[in-house]
Swiss-Prot record:
Transmembrane segments: none annotated. Disulfide bonds: none annotated. Pathway: Secondary metabolite biosynthesis; terpenoid biosynthesis. It comes from Aspergillus terreus (strain NIH 2624 / FGSC A1156). Homodimer. PANTHER family: METHYLTRANSFERASE AUSD (PTHR35897:SF1). The lineage of its organism: Eukaryota, Fungi, Dikarya, Ascomycota, Pezizomycotina. Keywords: S-adenosyl-L-methionine, Transferase. Disruption phenotype: Impairs the synthesis of terretonin but accumulates 3,5-dimethylorsellinic acid (DMOA). Methyltransferase; part of the gene cluster that mediates the biosynthesis of terretonin, a fungal meroterpenoid that acts as a mycotoxin. The first step of the pathway is the synthesis of 3,5-dimethylorsellinic acid (DMOA) by the polyketide synthase trt4. DMOA is then prenylated into farnesyl-DMOA by the polyprenyl transferase trt2. Methylation by the methyltransferase trt5 then leads to farnesyl-DMOA methyl ester which is further subject to epoxidation by the FAD-dependent monooxygenase trt8 to yield epoxyfarnesyl-DMOA methyl ester. Its EC number is 2.1.3.-. S-adenosyl-L-methionine binds at residues 124-125, 152-153. Belongs to the class I-like SAM-binding methyltransferase superfamily. This is Methyltransferase trt5.
Amino acid sequence: MHPDDQLKSALRNGFDPKLLYKEPLKTVKEPICTILEKYSKIPLEKVVSHINEVRDRAFAVFPYACIGQFSFVELSIADSPCYAEMLDRTKHGQKLLDLGCAFGQELRQLIFDGAPPTNLYGSDIQQDFLNLGYELFLDRAILPESQLIAADVLDKQSALFSRLSGKINVVYISLFLHVFQYKKQVTVVQNILDLLPAEPGALIVCRVTACRDQGVLNATRERMPYYYHDLASWKRLWEEVESQTGLRLSVETWEQPDELVKNHPLPGIYILGSAIRRL
């Protein structure tokens, strides 16, 4: 099922999007506060109201948890143990894609830290989110619109693949894969691999919502049918991809501390970090 259709189905089945809507922010954490002040040139006293206004417009488009709960201002890419490598590779001419980038907030972190904007790409299925990213960061003069591509990762005929197949050295995926069921995830991952050059060192860095007890999820899948991995299923996913593609991949995993899941209503939810390298 397409992620948009999943959401519509959940709403029909009684899911209340208000559960995903936090009260307006009163304070803003780092690093987003500094980025909006120093990079976007928004006066410090206006940063909070600016974020709240953009959040409300975005939530009206699609009531995702990442929007309603202000996840888009909880920047996480710099917390990855691979961040220094990702940043360095972009500074030396390699291309990075943030897939499922939402507002492109992680791209702005990279730019703020010195990555050349022309070496960065973002893609999201919602053009509205890409536009809202410009409203949030006020940086159309810095990040060219040509670097942001509205596309469905399942559509191999989309601009994402016609423009970028074989040209991306690093793909970053954050809280994106779980919206697909397992079999669709296999297809998504295979499509992502087509974006990478056929050479050793091509890298995929993932931040994945995971669950220590898969049984906990069974009662919720009719209402919100996401697929949260555990370590065993994550390993199985990549083994299946290797088997189907003939590629050799190195898969590293770690548990990544994350504020987002501290108050998750389901027990055993955590953030699984992973780095997949082509051998």
